[in-house]
Amino acid sequence: MIGSHDLRGLRERLPMSGSAGGRWLLLLALSAAATAVLADPAPEAVDPCATFNSDVRHERALFAGQAQPLAAAKAAAGAPAVTPEHLYQLQLHQRAEVTFAAPPAQRHPPPAAGYAGLVTLEVNAAGLYRVALNQALWIDVVAKGVSIQSSDFEGRRGCAAPHKIVEFMLPANTPLTLQFSGGITPTLTLAVTRAPAAAAPH
């Protein structure tokens, strides 16, 4: 890119005679340099959804599809089931109306005015799974009344498709409760996926 110091250097290198020809050459050179400055393309904006450290192409493809509406439950009993590799749009409830299967594990409790809800999940094969969300709420995966510690998480400001991905090592053929808390809107887009082999611990 040509800057102002380049223009000054160009002016110094050209002959500065008082003749009309010298002045004309100087004007032509400066005009060409200024045109080059104006024509220099601006840097392209970076898509925040493309800046995840891990490979999230599969989750992004799911979030580009049509979400299935589903009402989350206010308690674990009778909570609807979600299936891996499907996209859901959950309808959440006021936090005060929800009874959790286990106390949310976050350090600071969600505000009473936030949104919350529960669904169930069961996977056929044990391994590392991802829970992808379109907002920065808190998620717990509960098995037999105990929260499963997350293995990793990642989020990107400015990206909602997905905004946040949390990874958990899940047991096979075990009823699990996914509980959400601290939502800022009453709807939550959600997908559960199997983590790529490269992401799984060796």
Functional labels for PLM-detected ranges:
Residues 129, 169-182:
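Noncatalytic modules at the cell exterior or secretory-pathway interfaces
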Residues 123-130:
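Extended extracellular/luminal ectodomain segments enriched in beta-structured repeat modules
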Residues 136-150:
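Short, surface-exposed beta-strand/strand-loop-strand elements in extracellular ectodomains
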Residues 184-195:
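Edge beta-strands of jelly-roll/beta-sandwich modules across compartments, strongly enriched
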Residues 42-113, 199-202:
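Non-catalytic extracellular/lumenal accessory regions of secreted precursors
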Residues 160-171:
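Beta-sandwich interaction modules
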Residues 4-25:
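Bacterial N-terminal signal peptides that target proteins for export
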